[in-house]
Amino acid sequence: MSESDLRAAIRREMPGVRADLERLVRIPGVAFEGFDHSHVERSAVAVAELLRGCGLDTEIVRHGGQPAVIGRKAAPAGAPTVLLYAHHDVQPAGDPALWTSDPFEPVERDGRLYGRGAADDKAGVMAHVAALRAFGDQLPVGVVVFVEGEEEYGSDSLDTIIHEHLEELRSDVIVIADSGNWDIGRPALTTSLRGLVNMFAEVRVLKSAVHSGMFGGPVPDALITLARLLATLHDDDGEVAVPGLVGREGASVDYPADRFRHEAGILDGVDLIGRGTITDRIWTKPSISVLGVDAPRTLEAANALQPTAKAKISVRLAPGEDPKSAYDAVRAHLEKNVPWGAQLEVTLESDGQPCVIDATGPVYDAARAAFRSAWDGTEPVDMGVGGSIPFIATFQELFPAAAILVTGVEDPYSGAHGPDESLHLGEFERVCVAEALLLKNVAETMTR
């Protein structure tokens, strides 16, 4: 099919693609513990039906975790096979009061579709479906569509699924549609992602809670103890202060501080922390954040000193760093700096490898050409991402000859993982066009 034919086909398919995306968004498929996992099952069934509708041999697979979907269509003679990855599970919606509308009832406002998963990553699923629908029975490559069901919860069973279905997943090109673009109107290839270590730190100072008036003063309550300990993780500039955590500088993309402040929603008067350029700080240097604290709610807090306090700490690792070494470094720092002789327990929740992709060669040239065409001549950016997709390292290890392309539908205003997550509908159509053109270009580049 010609480029103009593919563009026209995508345009024809978009109403149906959007309707199917909205149906997916209405399924609250959260893989976290404590949520109704029957919705994740429903989501997997819906995705499987979409892939079967594209003519793929499709199965739902699971190995101890939430269901994934694998759809396959054999390559024409001499043509390459492309693996198309996305995930159908979503983050919890959080407090509904923070959303302008129901998080699981998609609503369009000002050219954006709002709803949990509208961008991350059900639109990634539908970008794959849109490209396949555009080709119909003229698909020039083989495809394996792999849609995971627990990415947001750490992909615990993903390695097992990959190893159990290794030959089915083996491909020449891997497209991971779980990232985003540099800006509205500016496409991007993601070429580096930080690694991740999530851990817990719990301090204990008392056998049980005691009266804050009778004992307050000489007794170090657990919340203040924990607060002082967490404060040692950064210096006065907000730079990570843990020996052994290293990064590098020199990210090449200019990211003005005022744009970053706007996109992050930083309040007036609040300083940025750390040192170096914005891109260094979010792409190539480590960061440490406190994601939550176990403590009494203020409305329920009694006049009592708390015996224990616990924090969840998230460490993002610079590309090239080892998660185990990073965990050991942070644990050693906490153990060295725990105040007032408090008892401390540090435990690992999860970790994931960072990755760097050498985005050179004919497949990457084909991808950039597809992006350039879909965005009417705009040159794509090679960018880093501060977040993590740990299984990319697994793909790199198991399929070393495959070219890995990290793409996606998000833009700086998508608000993934937060309230009012949204998808720019105009950019979504460009993403669908780009993926169809990518498959066309890969076929022309690699068919023997």
Question: PLM features: what roles do these ranges have?
Answer:
Residues 2-96, 308-312, 325:
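N-terminal helical capping/dimerization or prosegment-like subdomains
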Residues 79-147, 430:
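Active-site metal-coordination/substrate-binding segment of hydrolases
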Residues 88-90, 146-154, 177-182, 205-207, ...:
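Acidic, glycine-rich active-site loops and adjacent beta-strand->loop/helix elements
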Residues 117-192, 447-448:
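Acidic/histidine-rich catalytic neighborhood of metal-dependent amide-processing enzymes
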Residues 202, 226, 293, 305-309, ...:
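Zn-dependent metallopeptidase/amidohydrolase metal-coordination segment
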Residues 212-293, 321-343:
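Acidic-enriched catalytic cores of C-N bond-cleaving enzymes acting on peptides and small amides
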Residues 316-318, 345-360, 384-386:
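A short beta-alpha structural unit
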Residues 355-373:
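Short, low-order "capping/linker" segments at domain edges
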